[in-house]
Amino acid sequence: VYSVKGGDSLRLDRYTDTPAAEIDAKKPCMIFVFGGAFISGTRDAESYRPFFEYMAREQGYTVVSIDYRLGLKEPLAAGKLSPETFPQLLPQTVLMAVEDLYDATSFVAGKSAEWGIDPARIVACGSSAGAITVLQGAYFIANENPLTAKLPDGFDYAGVISFAGAVVDMADDLTWKRAPAPIMLFHGDADSNVPYRALRMGGAGIFGSDYIARQLSDMKSPYYFYSVEGADHALATVPMNNYRDAIDQFLTQQVGERLPAMIDTKERYSNSLPQDKDFTIETYIQSNFATK
């Protein structure tokens, strides 16, 4: 248990290939945040395990998969999730998830000596709702959000990996006070669960990977954007198994060696889906919650 919030005991699982007592040099760490539209999901889902084990055994990372509070679960169950309420509920939900991510990060950093972890090499990684959470965490650090007081003094992630994520802001645009940690973005441009570009809604916005990558490029901030034309929300999980070489390259060069590269890779499949260029708030709600 890394934190208790109300009636929720938030737990984490640690995956490592070498006991801390046998480690000569401190290992990098990956904190993973699961997906599930902020209404479902588990930190120990079987679909994630091969990726965790690969990162631990082949790449030498200690992987820490965390719980976080699912802020849309109760509003959905109570029938309070609608196009009218969503622009207020989503930012509150993401804020709560980032608070839990920061608490977990602080907990892990505090265990760094015991676990043989280098606190300067902690990478945040997430899928879907978890990807939104880690990107939001990086955005808050870059903008010195008051919530960052939960982190160790001067802390920043060594890198961030987002499998089909976005940043949520109560504004029509994202504004970065400074460049964030190196960011890797995977996204399909036919995703109907998380916008590939941007969705603006009642004074708030959900800014997807394409939008973020363009801003990072303008700032000359290191990033790796892996875009798949015609791919849907499968990019929330597929890269963990099928795009490991790209992930390894990002972690080695842009995170480990601090190579100031800005990489754009685009793939296209013969069975591509059409882009949803008119992504709306109704699209988001229908795709994520209609059958839940």
What are these regions (language model features)?
Residues 1-25:
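N-terminal cap/lid segment of alpha/beta-hydrolase-fold proteins
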Residues 25-37:
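Short beta-strand element of the alpha/beta-hydrolase
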Residues 42-43, 67-95:
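Cap/lid segment of the alpha/beta-hydrolase catalytic domain
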Residues 43-66, 73-75:
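Short amphipathic alpha-helix adjacent to the substrate-entry channel of hydrolases
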Residues 83-114:
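Alpha/beta-hydrolase active-site loop
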Residues 105-179:
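Primarily recognizes the serine-hydrolase "nucleophile elbow" in alpha/beta-hydrolase
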Residues 148-220:
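The feature captures the conserved acid-bearing segment of alpha/beta-hydrolase catalytic domains
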Residues 217-292:
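C-terminal catalytic histidine-bearing segment of alpha/beta-hydrolase fold enzymes
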